[in-house]
Amino acid sequence: MGALGLEGRGGRLQGRGSLLLAVAGATSLVTLLLAVPITVLAVLALVPQDQGGLVTDTADPGAQAQQGLGFQKLPEEEPEADLSPGLPAAHLIGAPLKGQGLGWEATKEQAFLTSGTQFSDADGLALPQDGLYYLYCLVGYRGRAPPGGAEPRGRSVTLRSSLYRAGGAYGPGTPELLLEGAETVTPVLDPAGRQGYGPLWYTSVGFGGLVQLRRGERVYVNISHPDMVDFARGKTFFGAVMVG
């Protein structure tokens, strides 16, 4: 009986101790669960916020300097200017002169003079320096067969355009032929058999080539039928450009 009494009393003590341990563990767990969110809220309340929660202030001067350098815009490099002078060039367009002559316009529409080139109807195109030049010329022509009673009636016409040079190192002697082109046209008679003019015809004589020229030499155009030149836009022009 004494032994049984001791065993019962000891079992009750062990059960009571287990219950106390369980209560203590549960209390600690609840305390821990409540402490974590409270701590997080306290930290968030103390952190300075700006611009949607991003931290912009820092106590480290070095970090501020690095942040400023990160947003620094580098200056754009300006392209180097091309200091080399342009090559001499000229483009002249045909213009009528008094007395049914062929003149040239140097400043209107597409015409131009660059890098020291000069022009006058009396002296022609003057080039400013020695070099290899590409010369070109195109002359448009138009006309019609004369009336039936006139002579020559229906005869072929040879149209010729030429480029010459004179002056400068070449000297004041006879101008030298540089380039030339020609075209033969046979005007059509009046198809109705009347004694009037034939239908209007159009053609052009064009050519170009490389020529070695010296400073001061003058280039000009000579044509065979100035009274037949077509002065419509883009039909008659000549020019030069230095290529070497």
Curated annotation (Swiss-Prot):
Membrane topology term: Single-pass type II membrane protein
GO molecular function annotation: cytokine activity; tumor necrosis factor receptor binding
Extracellular side: 49-244
Assembly, per entry: Heterotrimer of either two LTB and one LTA subunits or (less prevalent) two LTA and one LTB subunits.
Membrane topology (Cytoplasmic): 1-18
Membrane-spanning parts: 19-48
Residues modified by glycosylation: 222
Disulfide bonds: none
InterPro entries membership: TNF, TNF_C, TNF_CS, TNF_dom, Tumour_necrosis_fac-like_dom
Domain THD: 88-243
The gene coding this protein: LTB
SUPFAM superfamilies in the record: TNF-like (SSF49842)
Entry protein name: Lymphotoxin-beta
Any single GO BP term: positive regulation of canonical NF-kappaB signal transduction
Subcellular localization(s) per the UniProt record: Membrane
Keywords: Cytokine, Glycoprotein, Membrane, Signal-anchor, Transmembrane, Transmembrane helix
Sequence similarity: Belongs to the tumor necrosis factor family.
GO CC aspect terms: extracellular space; membrane
Pfam family, one: TNF
PANTHER family: LYMPHOTOXIN-BETA, TUMOR NECROSIS FACTOR FAMILY MEMBER
Annotated function: Cytokine that binds to LTBR/TNFRSF3. May play a specific role in immune response regulation. Provides the membrane anchor for the attachment of the heterotrimeric complex to the cell surface.
SMART domains listed in its UniProt record: TNF (SM00207)
